[in-house]
A protein has these predicted regions:
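Short, functional C-terminal segments
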Residues: 172-225
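Surface-exposed polar/charged interaction patches
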Residues: 29-36, 117-121, 145, 153, ...
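Exposed alpha-helical structural elements
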Residues: 44, 146, 167-168
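Structure-specific DNA junction-binding interface
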Residues: 1-84, 222
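Amphipathic alpha-helical packing elements
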Residues: 103, 107-156
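Intrinsic-disorder-associated interaction segments
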Residues: 4, 15-19, 96, 100-103, ...
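Aromatic-anchored, charged helix-turn/loop surface patch used as a conserved interaction hotspot
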Residues: 61-113
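Long, compositionally biased
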Residues: 57-72, 153-194
Length: 225
């Protein structure tokens, strides 16, 4: 049953596990100093990742939305990627925050869960994965084998979500490090604001920002949106 309470709870657990794995890879790369060299905006964030403890990463992973992205807002990219997959075409890949064999299983599971949500929980897939409605439709049409091939061909498209918003990441790690649940809830609110802006831009509509006066955003609130 679409959007049943059990389905949403299971999806939230899945999202948290994906976030944990993604953050662990990001922290490992930050400690090795071989990540984000070309992203000057992340210079201030790398120290937070490099010294993050397991408990800090675990708390940060509680964000009710995926902290990973695979061009989920780029309708044109997905249309071209699917066509290229069928034709065998290739193009030059852009620099990614994730690389190496460890990223492939993570990207595969991210896309598989996004595909599953697009097919059975389409009304919440935009919130949880940040998918534009048209991307949701495209992903839902794929087969598991299509996903396997796409991951291998386009692994470098796996990126941190809101990669160009370093302030969000700084707020997230500060709140997770300080063991401050109220600050974490404010970060969740920031997530919703960023998501609202993304969805509004894909539809060509102005976005009215959510204000703190509406109360803190918890996982249950985000799930019910």
């Amino acid at each position: 049953m679409e959007n049943s309470p059990l389905s949403v709870i299971l999806l939230n657990t899945t999202v948290r596990h994906l976030n944990e794995r993604g953050l662990a890879l990001m922290a490992k790369a930050a400690r090795a100093c071989d990540w984000a060299a070309g992203l000057s905006s992340w210079k201030e964030i790398r120290p937070f990742l490099a010294r993050a403890s397991e408990s800090t990463l675990s708390r940060a992973s509680r964000c009710p939305m995926t902290l990973l992205d695979f061009n989920f807002q780029r309708v044109t990219w997905w249309s071209r990627a699917i066509n290229r997959q069928n034709s065998g075409d290739s193009r030059q890949r852009s620099l990614s925050a994730f690389h190496g064999d460890e990223a492939i299983p993570l990207a595969h599971d991210l896309l598989l869960e996004a595909w599953s949500a697009a097919r059975s929980l389409s009304s919440v897939s935009s919130l949880v994965f940040g998918m534009a409605p048209e991307v949701t439709t495209l992903i839902a049409q794929l087969s598991p084998r299509d996903i396997d091939q796409l991951v291998v061909q386009e692994i470098q498209e796996l990126r941190p979500r809101w990669e160009t918003r370093p302030m969000f990441w700084k707020e997230l790690f500060q709140a997770a490090t300080q063991m401050d649940d109220e600050n974490l809830e404010n970060v969740y609110l920031h997530c919703l604001q960023l998501l609202g802006g993304e969805l509004a831009s894909t539809r060509g509509q102005p976005f009215i920002s959510v204000t703190a006066a509406q109360g803190p955003v918890t996982e249950a609130t985000a799930q019910a949106s």
